[in-house]
Amino acid sequence: MPASLRSPLAIILGAIPGALARYYATIFLAGLFGNDLPYATFLINFSGCVGMGLVVTLATQPALMSPDLRLLLAVGFLGSYTTFSTYALEVTSLWRMGQLGQGVLYGLGSLGIGTIGVLLGSLIARRLTI
């Protein structure tokens, strides 16, 4: 297989089961806990963050995980299972590099800008349908 196709293929092979895992986990957890609060999303985000921590830590040792497997799991599976795990990884990476202020700013800024983005998108959609 050409080297240029290895990375995209690894990501694709992880993304499909990641998306399906999120879908079925959401159905299962909503049935278990109800829909009063978004428990399913909360638990999926938490489990995705645990998974990201495991993958990224194991990937630092090439004997334990190949670069292709890291892409399949971290970018493909966990990326489609929950992007929150990537966000949390980026915040903790900034902290580990001694950039506490930037980590806090990025973390809070992402939450704020994400919320504003959803509100803005909703406003635009309402304007388009009027």
Swiss-Prot record:
Localization (cell): Cell inner membrane
Key words, A-Z: Cell inner membrane, Cell membrane, Ion channel, Ion transport, Membrane, Metal-binding, Sodium, Transmembrane, Transmembrane helix, Transport
InterPro entries (alphabetical): FluC (IPR003691)
Annotated catalysed reactions: fluoride(in) = fluoride(out)
Main localization (coarse): membrane
Transmembrane segments: 9-29, 39-59, 71-91, 104-124
Claim: Chloroplast is one of the keywords in the record: no
Listed Pfam families: CRCB
GO cellular component: plasma membrane
GO biological process: cellular detoxification of fluoride; fluoride transmembrane transport
Regulation: Na(+) is not transported, but it plays an essential structural role and its presence is essential for fluoride channel function.
GO molecular function, one term: fluoride transmembrane transporter activity
Superkingdom classification of source: Bacteria
UniProt-annotated binding residues for Na(+): G79, T82
Topological category with respect to the lipid bilayer: Multi-pass membrane protein
Keyword Membrane annotated: yes
Homology family: Belongs to the fluoride channel Fluc/FEX (TC 1.A.43) family.
HAMAP family: FluC
Entry function: Fluoride-specific ion channel. Important for reducing fluoride concentration in the cell, thus reducing its toxicity.
Record-given protein name: Fluoride-specific ion channel FluC
Organism field: Synechocystis sp. (strain ATCC 27184 / PCC 6803 / Kazusa)
Source organism phylogeny: Bacteria, Bacillati, Cyanobacteriota, Cyanophyceae, Synechococcales
